Amino acid sequence: MRILVKLICFTILLFSRKSVYCKQHVIEGDILVHKSELLRNAVNRESRLWPNATIPYKIVASEWRENPWMLYLILDTMNKIEAQTCIRFVPRSDEKSFLVFNSNTSDCSSYIGRIGRPQPIYIGPRCAAVTVAHEIMHAIGFQHAHTRPDRDNFIEILWDNIKRKKQMNFEKANSLDYTTFTQFDFDSIMLYDPYTFSQNRKATLISKVPGIDIRRKSEKLGLSEMDVISINTLYKCDFNEKLRKY
C-alpha cells in the first residue's frame, strides 16, 4: 500500500544535475561532497540529521519511464527502512532540504546526511537493490564501514591490489570524526565489496577474523540487523517496536 501511495503522490522535478550542483565531487566511489564541505564529521553533526527522522523526497518522474524497475526498487527500499526504523520518507511539499532521486547518470552516489538544500541521490540503471539501500543509508547519515577508526582490528587493506589513484578511498577516519554504534559488522551494506577498486582482480580488503569472510555485494539482500540498530540509535528510535529483520 505504501508503494502505491508514493507512486501516486511523488512530485515531478525538472532540473538537471549540472544546474543544481556544479561543484560536487565524488569520493570513496559513491559519496558526493561539495568542495567547501568537510566529509568526515557528517554523522557527528546534529545539523546533518533529518529533523524528526523525516526525510522529504522528490522523484523526477519522467526519468524513470524507461526503467520503472529502478523506481520500484527505490520505493521498496524506503518502505523496508520505514518498517525497520522510525525514519519516514514523505513527498516533498515546501521543505528546503529534501532528496532528489535522479537517474540521469551511470553512477550510484549520494551525500552523507542532510546538507540543508535539495540534494541528489543518483541511481543509475546498473545500481542493484542493495546499492539503492546503500545510497539511501548514506543520505540518512552513514559513512562506509571500511573507514571506521577501529577497522584494523577486523579487516586488512591490501594496498598493493588497489588502483593507485583510488587508494585515497581506503583511508581510515579518525575517532573524533566517525561515530560507531555497533561492533564491526561484516554483513553491513555500508562495507565495501572485497574487490572494490582492484587493479589485478585480487581482493582489496579481507577479514582478519577467523571463519568470517567479506561477502560480495551481490550476496547481501539488504540492511543487516546491525545496520538497523545503527539507524535506530542515531535517530533515537524505539527499539522495541522497530527491531525486526526483513
List the predicted regions and their residue ranges.
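Zinc-dependent metalloendopeptidases
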Residues: 2-7, 11-246
